[in-house]
Amino acid sequence: MEQRRLASTEWVDIVNEENEVIAQASREQMRAQCLRHRATYIVVHDGMGKILVQRRTETKDFLPGMLDATAGGVVQADEQLLESARREAEEELGIAGVPFAEHGQFYFEDKNCRVWGALFSCVSHGPFALQEDEVSEVCWLTPEEITARCDEFTPDSLKALALWMKRNAKNEAVETETAE
């Protein structure tokens, strides 16, 4: 019994201020001790200005019932960031076989969480297959609608979305300048 319990334990890399792996811990220990770790954040959008928003189930170990402006999750021990993003998108929403754009990394910290986030995006129109134990529902919202309801969202996903929007605006500005 003990061996089976250990085999099902989810292990995560614990990182320092420079995002260097310094240890591994169980996901449960990481949450209980608010250890610094890595996570992926995937902005799923329709390519026409709407963002796919998910409601977290009430059974989630972190911020249950809140809205997420991004898909994603904790990176497992020794897992590559893009591999983690693809795994999370497929597990949570059934998204597979679509290109992912990488938008760099960022750091987020508050009283509940210390995380190095890897930011990705993808375009998808569904249909979506929700992971019942993690996602209770999804809907499409504009960035303005998300901002108007920001108190309903996980703070780390709002930071990821703001960073994506800022980096997207810079890319669009460069493309416009190049086209002129």
Swiss-Prot record:
PANTHER family: ISOPENTENYL-DIPHOSPHATE DELTA-ISOMERASE. Mg(2+) binds at E88, E92. This is Uncharacterized Nudix hydrolase YfcD. GO terms for cellular component: cytoplasm; cytosol. It is an enzyme of class 3 (hydrolase). Disulfide bonds: none annotated. Keywords: Hydrolase, Magnesium, Metal-binding. InterPro entries: NUDIX_hydrolase-like_dom_sf, NUDIX_hydrolase_dom, NUDIX_hydrolase_YfcD_pred. Its cofactor is Mg(2+). A motif (Nudix box) lies at residues 72-94. Its EC number is 3.6.-.-.
